[in-house]
Structures are given as C-alpha cells and as structure tokens.
Amino acid sequence: MSFCAFSRYRTKVALNCLLRRQITTKRRNMSKHSIKTVWKENNTFSTNIDGHNIVIDLGEDQGGQDQGPRPKQLMLAAAAGCTGLDVISMLRKMRVEVEHFDIKVDAELTEEHPLKYKTMKLIYEFKGDDLPEKKIERAVKLSFENYCGVLAMYKSCVPVSYEIKINED
C-alpha cells in the first residue's frame, strides 16, 4: 500500500470513528431527560418542557389558586399520553382508522401519607365503523406490556390493569 493510499485509509478510519462517537453521544443525550420547575408564588410552580409551559398548582380547597393541574394528575396524564402515542402509532401501521380514541385513567390513592396511588386502571375507548377488535386488542396489549415506559414504571410498584371499550356509549 502506498503512503497516499495508507494516509487516505487512516483519514477514512478516523472519520468513521469520529462519526460513531458523535452518533453514540447523540444517543446518550436522547436517553436522558432534564427539566426545571420554578416556584412562582404561593403554591404555584411552572415547568417548561421543550418550550411547552405547564403550570402546576393546588386547588383552592387545598390553599392553591387552581391555576393548573395537580402533580399526581399529571402523572396519570403522562401514563395515558405515553400509551396513547404507542397505540395510535401501531394502529396506523396496521392501517386501522379510528374516528375517536380516549383513554380514561382511574387511580385510587392510599389513605395515609405519603398519598400515593395504590391501584390504577386504564380504560381505552375506541369509536369508528367496522373496527377490527383483534388489531385494537393487539395494539393496546403491546403498548401495555412492552412499549410504554411510563406504564412500566408504574407497574413496578402499583397494580395496573386495563379495559378496552369499542363503540360503547
């Protein structure tokens, strides 16, 4: 191998190595989340997540100003949003068109402090013409058992169940 060919080879190897390092660094950054929550006044906090502002507060009956949802309710919304994104994405890939899709989350709190959820149930509600039950059941089951990271965290410490309703009123 001539010196020029060897030099080109070393340059190519170095570039590939650098590119791999950049991709690995990018992956590492994507696997970490960081947020900042700022106290505004009284019991009101503000959190900015990727440019989306969320106000967190207590109800007036709890000494707050009711300017935003409560933290535990946001946890339920995160669970519903996570599994909902999974399910609707899988249904699209399965070429299933739904007209309406809701997820209701019922969770029961403990009676003693710290108040935490002791059970959780997700109710997936679908509406549409000629919806294929098997595909819907498969999408929900895959999200519930394999893909939704928020539900995986919940299931590690709380019994979580689900129900599917198709074209029910």
Language model features with spans:
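Short glycine/serine/threonine-rich phosphate/pyrophosphate-binding segments
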Residues: 85
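Alpha-helical metal-binding/catalytic segments enriched in His/Glu/Asp
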Residues: 82
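Extended beta-strand/beta-hairpin segments
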Residues: 23-77, 88-169
